[in-house]
């Protein structure tokens, strides 16, 4: 008696595995690029949130001065995740300069730089900054934080 069972041959299974591998090779880089773009969008949005929170802080509890991320978080002006200075693959920093009566107004600048700057797990390809004027700046020339407010302002302005 012949025992004939229906099923897939080894060749057919290998062909299916090869096709899945080809599809994955095409899809994965696109997914990683989408993730980087989402991280960059989140970083820009977070910087705009910081800018808005700084205005509220200065007008309410800052006595004319701006606050640090920790101070903004303590007043519930920004997301608690953002007060840890790390969100969506970016590291954030905020540097206020206090008001000096009769000499200079209070200012601040905030920056966002990618946590991972190279390789497959790269979290972003650009750094961003925003200052007291509210204009978003960004570039990919260096993936380190801007040194000061003048460096933020000197960077190319993004479509605001």
Residues of each region from the PLM?
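Short, flexible coil/turn micro-motifs enriched in small/turn-prone residues
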Residues: 2, 13-16, 36, 84, ...
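N-terminal single-pass transmembrane signal-anchor helix
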Residues: 2-31
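Conserved hydrophobic/amphipathic alpha-helical signal-anchor segments
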Residues: 6, 25, 30-78
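Alpha-helix termini
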Residues: 20, 34-38, 147
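Extracellular/periplasmic head regions of type IV pilus-like filament subunits
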Residues: 52-126, 130-133, 140, 151-160
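A short acidic/small-residue loop/turn micro-motif
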Residues: 142-146
